[in-house]
């Protein structure tokens, strides 16, 4: 594992890069939740599953966390810094999959089109503030539009006890609801790894199986 610093318009990011045992086949860039670090059980389960399939993996500590802040700041600034990080990591030309947990999942969805991601892995996607589900006549409380606007294939993994809500099946290419899990997604990392490995196998240029035709349509 190699840790590098990448300078962005929001300050330095720290990135832990790992390589697969064999020839690299694709790149997976992952990040943390709003006040967290990228070494949570769910993020590490994704990293390990991806690396077993031949991915170069990059776990990103975003600039605001490197500074010691727990608040991400504006979405525009966060997204701009993320795009700069991914650009610095993507010079190999490998197919890109990006993702994160909670706030990091939102960043991955919002920037997927811009960075040309082949797929997004959204862990514990925070559909709405706790206890405030989005309903007709109450705009702005549901964040499902971020999933739908990703412009690429999206895998969502949420716990069935997540107070931030659970996306609907048609909000993404695949929505996996894990029984007994809360927003932390910490109880069954093996199930997360299995779901991620299965889904990665459907991505063109990465897997050997045809992509799923259910849920969100892939980009043309």
Language model features with spans:
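Gly/Ala-rich beta-loop-alpha elbow adjacent to hydrolase catalytic centers
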Residues: 100-108
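Hydrolases whose catalytic domains are alpha/beta-hydrolase-1, hotdog thioesterase
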Residues: 107-111, 131
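Serine-hydrolase catalytic machinery in alpha/beta-hydrolase-like enzymes
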Residues: 5-95, 107, 143
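Catalytic histidine-centered segment of alpha/beta-hydrolase-like enzymes
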Residues: 181-193
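Short beta-strand/loop motif that positions the catalytic acidic residue
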Residues: 150, 156-158
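Active-site nucleophile loop of the alpha/beta-hydrolase fold
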Residues: 62-63, 122-130, 159-161, 181
């Amino acid at each position: 594992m190699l840790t590098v610093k990448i300078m962005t318009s929001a300050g330095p990011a720290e990135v832990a890069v790992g390589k697969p045992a064999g020839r690299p086949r694709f790149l997976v860039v992952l990040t943390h939740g709003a006040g967290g670090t990228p070494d949570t059980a769910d993020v590490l389960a994704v990293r390990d599953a991806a690396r077993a399939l031949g991915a170069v993996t990059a776990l990103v500590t975003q600039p605001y966390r490197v500074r010691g802040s727990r608040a991400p700041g504006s979405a525009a600034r966060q997204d701009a810094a993320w795009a700069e990080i991914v650009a610095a990591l993507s010079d190999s030309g490998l197919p890109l999959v990006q993702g994160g947990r909670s706030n990091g999942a939102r960043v991955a969805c919002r920037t997927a089109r811009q960075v040309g991601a082949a797929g997004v892995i959204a862990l514990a996607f925070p559909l709405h503030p706790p206890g405030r589900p989005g309903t007709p006549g109450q705009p702005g409380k549901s964040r499902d539009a971020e999933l739908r606007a990703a412009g690429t294939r999206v895998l969502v993994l949420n716990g069935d006890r997540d107070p931030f809500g659970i996306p609907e099946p048609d909000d993404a290419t695949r929505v996996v609801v894990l029984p007994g899990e809360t927003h932390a997604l910490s109880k069954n990392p093996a199930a997360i790894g299995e779901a991620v490995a299965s889904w990665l196998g459907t991505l063109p240029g990465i897997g050997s199986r045809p992509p799923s035709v259910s849920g969100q349509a892939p980009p043309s």
